[in-house]
């Protein structure tokens, strides 16, 4: 609060040091210029700047200081490592969107090249396009699949129609991580059958970090290393274990743009 005028304004004249007295933010609170939300001693040029996808209906630009950004990636690398995925050497089949403008598209392709991944764009997943995707799996030694749940499920249904198990034609595959959208149990069973590899579910938010990740025992493991996760009722009171409520998440390390 002492270092960020945006939060000082939200708190107002309250002088309490109690955690529960702090206001809970929503994305509408953040619909103002980034420069008005950054902490003292930070500028857009000294931080990592990105924007959310808008899947919740309220897209916005956010920032992370370099230390927080590095810790986010350390958290991701650690969890993928549970499944013997090494970001330096493992080759990723990536089912994600990509900017359509020329410069944005080329930047993303260069990032893919440097990050050891091959991107399948998800804007057109017709049978003709999926046939081309299948050819890539026949000819490239992918180690793992990562991307949007719905796109990966659609590819699995295509394989089912062809009576093909992906592991049979791409034996280097080890695991598939799905993200961004809910994975239903029926779809997970389909993916396991048509891919022939373990299916791992993750839940995250780009402005925060991985929030929860399925561990090797098949259980959801909440990220308590970089986030403080609370389950609250409609009056913002902490609920007892096992009760349903709202996820309220605090990033523990982002000093430039606290959440």
In which residue ranges do the predicted regions lie?
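Nucleotide 5′-phosphate-binding alpha/beta core
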Residues: 1-51, 56-91, 98, 134-146, ...
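Short acidic/polar alpha-helix capping motifs at helix-coil junctions
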Residues: 44, 96-101, 149-155
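Short, acidic Gly/Pro/Ser/Thr-rich loop/turn segments
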Residues: 59, 100-102, 254-257
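Alpha-helical membrane-targeting segments
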Residues: 88, 106-115
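Rossmann-like NAD(H)/NADP(H) cofactor-binding core
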Residues: 91-93, 201
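Short, well-ordered beta-strand segments
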Residues: 93-95, 248
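Conserved coil-to-alpha-helix start sites within the AMP-binding
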Residues: 98-109, 127-128
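Active-site glycine/GP-rich loop and adjacent strand/helix microenvironment
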Residues: 112-259
